[in-house]
Regions:
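Intrinsic-disorder-associated interaction segments
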Residues: 9-13, 202-205, 228, 473, ...
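Short alpha-helical interface patches
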Residues: 103, 112-120, 133-135, 211-221, ...
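Transmembrane and membrane-interface helices of multi-pass
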Residues: 2-203
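Generic structural signal of hydrophobic/aromatic residues within well-ordered alpha-helices
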Residues: 32, 118, 209-212, 232, ...
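Solvent-exposed soluble domains appended to multi-pass membrane proteins
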Residues: 246, 250-266, 272-275, 279-652
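Intrinsic-disorder/low-complexity, polar/charged segments
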Residues: 40-45, 77, 228, 319-320, ...
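Membrane-interface segments at or immediately adjacent to transmembrane helices
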Residues: 179-272
Length: 652
């Protein structure tokens, strides 16, 4: 007892434990959270992810420690401080685990604007609590109980020291958030490198807390310095002038090149199908892998009488909506902050897009997607892009679902999606004489892959493969190849149906992105197909087909950017292009095949990370027009007859 005070002096061992507890508890919570996010924590996780990027985890540890300290200064209730810190450390990790399951992307800051929608989707999807979450709850309860007994009898603090302690801790927290987390120059010094390709990998490397906090920098858009009405008008004047002297379409064998203009179809039905994770996996047969069936027989047959090539995707392993956004608009996500999601953050008002433009030309429009309407905010983004109707999973009845080993509720098959597309087409045809634009997005072949997703008698089998592939990887490849076989059957079903309708139809079919198979790159590296880098250009060129029931010209498209899918389709079929699409086709003709996420593909198909000044100028002009149409005053809209879509200037 201190002399004259009546206060018992705290024993040194107890004092030491009280000082160590918040540091230890915050470290334990950090590890619990990472275990939740990853499903488990193994020695390999520490060796491959945590230790090589230790700076990111030290920042997260410091953040949790300061949160505990601030709560303790304010409430002087250690169990409450422990609970608050644990919720902050573990809840985002649990959300991250489920968002990865549902959409292949981690928990991002802008998801906070959709809490109620996400809760509804999670409930409908039948998500289950994981063992790692149960362990975390038990450990947190033990920590809370421990803090109660450890700090019991601690003398009360007067209000002035508490106020000073609270202020100092809050200041330290602000310094950490605004002076470190939100300063890319500082985080890069700590070894935290932005990853434009794959947010999932970014979170695996740097952890959920640091990944989430650093993504807060991706909320604002910077206006191009040269942006003005004069600059936009001058650029569009140049496009207009160039078109007057254009001597030929992009491709010499295309329908528009070989068919007299007065004989060309003016308003065909246009159907887009973006197939989940689709690329022609039979290409691996050139690299030592053989399958027990021809997984792409319809594709290969149709390539003889269609326009075919590759779409350069901005995504790998996830980010389906990024690819969809590019294809529907001609906008490049490369100009947007790394990790941002256009549908959630930017498509918040009507804007120029293929559906809105076609509506101006008299089309009726609809979208079909066999997942929940609210995910990726499609229910809000689609109307702003110009879709009159949206048929989502909630509206589908009697559809077949597969792959229930990983996806508890199953995924709608591509065959059922073909039926949905045909039904929607027939419904639109019967209700209106207007031409149709119908856009569909599938789900059957979504990651993750496991041989148990299909019965043995339904799954494509790998007959031979290079040495070094693990059995689990071979099984995952069989799962993936089965999805490709079924996507090919869907393609055959659709082209067979639309070849018999009595009106002109264009069908554009492409894959959104590649994925890791069995959570690794072994299929690509062991065969020599590609490297183990998600930035490898080979892993961004998905299969693309443009077919019509009124033209049999074979056209080799080569590789084009996903944002060029709509402009190129309109060019090869001789459809009236908006000025913005004319600009994109001009860029494709003279500058580059794509400029995506730091990779430029030259006109000859070679790639570089160092574009020429000429290519950089075209890219800058692309961003100028995109900024005007997405965020600016919409000066270009007047020139395209879409002045009604013009909104107020916004940079956020």
């Amino acid at each position: 007892m201190r002399k004259g005070t009546g206060i018992m002096k705290t024993p040194k061992p107890l004092l030491a434990l009280r000082m160590v507890f918040p540091l230890a508890a915050s470290l334990i919570v950090l590890l619990l959270g990472e275990g939740i996010a990853r499903g488990s924590l193994s020695a390999d996780v520490f060796a491959s992810f945590i230790f090589p990027h230790i700076g990111a985890y030290l920042l997260a540890w410091l953040l949790l420690f300061l949160v505990w300290l601030l709560l303790d200064w304010v409430f002087r209730c250690p169990p409450l401080s422990t609970l608050g810190m644990a919720v902050l450390g573990c809840a985002p990790c649990a959300v991250n685990f489920y968002t990865l399951q549902l959409r292949g992307e981690p928990f991002l800051p802008w998801d906070l604007t959709q809490v109620s929608e996400a809760a509804g989707v999670a409930s409908a999807a039948g998500l289950k609590i994981q063992p790692s979450m149960v362990v975390a709850i038990i450990v947190v309860l033990v920590l809370m109980a421990g803090s109660f007994f450890l700090y019991r009898g601690r003398h009360k603090q007067r209000w002035l020291p508490r106020l000073a302690g609270s202020a100092a801790t809050a200041a330290a927290l602000c310094l950490l958030v605004f002076g470190v987390y939100l300063q890319p120059a500082v985080t890069q010094v700590l070894g935290i490198t932005p990853d434009a390709w794959m947010q999932d990998r970014y979170y695996r490397y740097y952890g959920v807390i640091t990944g989430f906090m650093t993504n807060l920098t991706n909320l604002e858009i910077s206006k191009p310095e040269e942006y003005s009405q004069e600059a936009v008008d001058a650029l569009l004047d140049n496009v207009d002038e160039s078109q007057k002297f254009a001597t030929s379409p992009l491709y010499s064998t295309s329908y528009s090149a070989v068919t007299p203009k007065d004989e060309q179809v003016k308003q065909p039905t246009i159907i887009y199908v973006m197939d989940e994770s689709y690329w022609d996996v039979s290409e691996l047969e050139q690299y030592g892998i053989t399958f027990d069936t021809d997984v792409s027989k319809n594709l290969h047959a149709l390539q003889q009488t269609s326009a075919y090539g590759r779409a350069y995707s901005p995504s790998f392993g996830g980010g389906t909506c990024d690819v969809e956004f590019e294809a529907l608009t001609g906008y490049s996500v490369s100009f947007l902050p790394s990790g941002s999601k256009p549908y959630q953050q930017h498509v918040t008002k009507p804007m120029f897009a293929m559906p809105n433009y076609l509506k101006l030309k008299g089309y009726q429009t609809a979208a079909v997607h066999c997942f929940w309407a609210k995910y990726w905010s499609r229910d809000k983004a689609y109307p702003n892009l110009g879709f009159d109707d949206f048929i989502s999973l909630e509206d589908m009845h009697g559809v077949t679902k597969v792959r229930k080993h990983y996806w508890t509720s199953g995924l709608v098959t591509d065959d059922s999606m073909a039926d949905q597309i045909i039904q929607q087409y027939e419904s639109m045809k019967s209700s209106s004489d207007k031409p149709i634009f119908l856009h569909a997005v599938t789900m059957q072949n979504h990651t993750n892959y496991n041989k148990d997703n299909y019965p043995d008698d339904e799954r494509v089998k790998v007959l031979s493969h290079p040495a070094g592939l693990k059995p689990s990887t071979v099984g995952a490849l069989e799962d993936f190849a089965t999805g490709i076989r079924d996507a090919d059957a869907m393609l055959g079903k659709l082209t067979e149906y639309f070849s018999q309708v009595d009106e002109p139809v264009i069908l554009v079919f492409w894959g959104d992105h590649y994925n890791p198979i069995d959570s690794n790159y072994d299929v690509y590296t062991t065969t020599g197909y590609a490297s183990d880098s998600s930035a490898d250009p080979r892993l961004h060129q998905t299969t693309l087909l443009m077919w019509s029931n009124y033209n049999q010209q074979q056209v080799d498209l080569g590789t084009i950017a996903a944002y060029d899918i709509s402009p190129v389709m309109m060019d090869i079929y001789g459809l009236e292009e908006p000025l913005y699409f004319q600009f994109l086709n001009r860029q494709l003709r003279v500058a580059s095949r794509t400029n995506t996420r730091g990779t430029t593909m030259n006109l000859d198909g070679t790639t570089t990370q160092e574009p020429t000044e000429f290519q950089q100028r075209w890219s800058a002009e692309h961003w100028l027009l995109q900024y005007d149409l997405m965020f600016g005053r919409g000066y270009a809209l007047q020139r395209m007859g879409l002045a009604g879509l013009s909104g107020v200037d916004t940079g956020k």
